Amino acid sequence: MKKITSFTIDHTKLNPGIYVSRKDTFENVIFTTIDIRIKAPNIEPIIENAAIHTIEHIGATLLRNNEVWAEKIVYFGPMGCRTGFYLIIFGNYESKDLIDLISWLFSEIVNFSEPIPGASHKECGNYKEHNLDMAKYESSKYLQILNNIKEENLKYP
């Protein structure tokens, strides 16, 4: 079988950051998949389930309610390896184009004080597994990277 693109990235050299994972075109519409890498793979501890679940709920809600980006958001969700998230958006974007949006998103999560969106048994298949404090902690650590972003945090190795 042919390797998928994400498996061709050298994860031993991958830093936390914002990366264009791939671009796809369907019926003349470009979709850009963004790798929101929060942890250095196989070096830092992965994000615990309850925190990543909470970031997913808050993040998806905030992105789909963002006045500028809402109509461009296709998907926001966690990576199976639990080192970050994928964001799929309509349009042709580069990593640097998303710095402000992703910085805003994680800043909002750090300051989030409302009930976690979609965290009831009617709205979520695993509604009991959330941890807002850890979601804020992980988001705060990632913001430190975003606030000092370098080229090595924007292009795959």
From Swiss-Prot:
Fe cation binds at residues 53, 57, 124. It catalyses: S-(5-deoxy-D-ribos-5-yl)-L-homocysteine = (S)-4,5-dihydroxypentane-2,3-dione + L-homocysteine. Keywords: Autoinducer synthesis, Iron, Lyase, Metal-binding, Quorum sensing. It holds the Pfam family LuxS. One of its GO terms (biological process) is quorum sensing. Its cofactor is Fe cation. Its EC number is 4.4.1.21. GO terms for molecular function: iron ion binding; S-ribosylhomocysteine lyase activity. InterPro entries: LuxS_sf (IPR037005), Metalloenz_LuxS/M16 (IPR011249), S-ribosylhomocysteinase (IPR003815). Binds 1 Fe cation per subunit. It is an enzyme of class 4 (lyase). Belongs to the LuxS family. HAMAP family: LuxS. Involved in the synthesis of autoinducer 2 (AI-2) which is secreted by bacteria and is used to communicate both the cell density and the metabolic potential of the environment. The regulation of gene expression in response to changes in cell density is called quorum sensing. Catalyzes the transformation of S-ribosylhomocysteine (RHC) to homocysteine (HC) and 4,5-dihydroxy-2,3-pentadione (DPD). Homodimer. PANTHER family: S-RIBOSYLHOMOCYSTEINE LYASE (PTHR35799:SF1). This is S-ribosylhomocysteine lyase. The gene is luxS.
